[in-house]
Amino acid sequence: MGCRQSSEEKEAARRSRRIDRHLRSESQRQRREIKLLLLGTSNSGKSTIVKQMKIIHSGGFNLEACKEYKPLIIYNAIDSLTRIIRALAALKIDFHNPDRAYDAVQLFALTGPAESKGEITPELLGVMRRLWADPGAQACFGRSSEYHLEDNAAYYLNDLERIAAPDYIPTVEDILRSRDMTTGIVENKFTFKELTFKMVDVGGQRSERKKWIHCFEGVTAIIFCVELSGYDLKLYEDNQTSRMAESLRLFDSICNNNWFINTSLILFLNKKDLLSEKIRRIPLSVCFPEYKGQNTYEEAAVYIQRQFEDLNRNKETKEIYSHFTCATDTSNIQFVFDAVTDVIIQNNLKYIGLC
């Protein structure tokens, strides 16, 4: 009996040591795994950040992956032009050349088959080129803040010949500029600085935000993306709410949420290139009537940054790490993400008492 007890005790001790080793190993693994949650309103550039991580840390897009983006890019180009043409009547803008009215009819007749096949026929290419070149369409494009038009419209429409070529293969820049509405939860894993990152992107539309709660568990850091250039635009969902106001409300709810007391909060003030171009034409006061500064990129960008950072109600214990970004610029995102990773590592060490 005594021997049997001793044997059982030894086995129990061995089992306990195995469990302890497993727990230590699991604890170390969890410390090396960084869960990054990408949040922000629709059109803030979250999905482009995910693509950049694939380019920078996961080998990029091979030939087959590039080819898979062709139908989406064709759709983006066609959709942009059809939005412009539809907006002409609403904005009371006429074609400069009356013949373009027939081309507009042809555009709507030809787009369905083109989108389903993922290719632009020579006939459709001619129609699209003539419409896009018309001064009336260009005037309508210049007023795109008055209707919904993606940022990539001019990029694709200025390069229709290349995109419509039968042997067209999207470039990395084409892919970065492509736009597809994120629905559900998209995860991307990669390794950097001996850490395993799990980047989670969830849709920014109002209808998608109810899914965010499912991603909150175990979050190491949040990257909140802001569309700097959206200060004069309305939400796609209701065409009334200011995109910037919606972004500020959303950031307030995330920044001051009890879920994220010990979570690093990184603010990506994105689309700085578009803000730099737009601020020369449209004053920041259309969004912030109290703004009295110059309509320059430098002053406007800092003012917007302050609006977000001032929402932090726990400044003594919680720091916001802000970066101005251009999500389509790989070198910029690579530099910023390197700095972000260092902050995350330091904050993790502080949290576990090693710093």
Swiss-Prot record:
G-proteins are composed of 3 units; alpha, beta and gamma. The alpha chain contains the guanine nucleotide binding site. Interacts with ADGRB2. Residues 32-355 form the G-alpha domain. Mg(2+) binds at residues 47, 182. The gene is Gnaz. Residues 266-273 are annotated as: G4 motif. This is Guanine nucleotide-binding protein G(z) subunit alpha. GO terms for molecular function: adenylate cyclase inhibitor activity; G protein-coupled receptor binding; G protein-coupled serotonin receptor binding; G-protein beta/gamma-subunit complex binding; GTP binding; GTPase activity; metal ion binding. InterPro entries: Gprotein_alpha_I, Gprotein_alpha_su, GproteinA_insert, P-loop_NTPase. PANTHER family: GTP-BINDING PROTEIN ALPHA SUBUNIT (PTHR10218), GUANINE NUCLEOTIDE-BINDING PROTEIN G(Z) SUBUNIT ALPHA (PTHR10218:SF65). Residues 1-26 are annotated as: Disordered.
